[in-house]
Amino acid sequence: IHPDWDYIGCETLFAKLLFVEYSQGYAIIELLGEWNDALNNDIMEFKRRIIDALIAQRIDKFLMIGDNLLNFHGYEDYYYQEWNEEINDGWIVFMNVRDQIVQEFKNCHLTKYIWFGSSFNLTFWRTQDPLALCQRVNEKITLSIK
C-alpha cells in the first residue's frame, strides 16, 4: 500500500485524512480496503484512533469517501450510535460506496446514524474545492431534514 495511506489499527482498512476545516467542523476522510466489524471491530479502532481526536477538535461533520472501500462486514451498531450522539447537530456521510456496502449498512440498521446512498454519489468529487464539497453535502442533508 502506498505510504499516503495511514495505518489506523485495522488489518484491512486504511484511511487518508484529506481535509479538515476546523471553524466549520468539516472533515473529509478517504477509505481503502475492507471494513470488517464482524471479525476485527474496525469501527472501534477507527473511532478511537481517528474520529475521537477530530471530535475533540470540534469536528462534527464527517464526509467518508468510499470509492476504494471494497467491502463492509457489519456487526453491532454501538460505536456508530456513540459517534452519532457525540456530534449532536453534525452528520456522518458515506459517499460513493458500492451497492453491496449500501445493502450491508441497511442490514445493520445504520440508517439511524449515517447518511449514504445515490444522492451522495459524486463522480467528480476530487476536482471540487473540499470546502465547497462539504457545504454541498451539508445543504443536501439540511434539505432532507426539513
Please tell me what each predicted stretch does.
Residues 1-22, 26-68, 72-146:
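Amphipathic, Lys/Arg-enriched alpha-helical "gate/interface" segment within cytosolic domains
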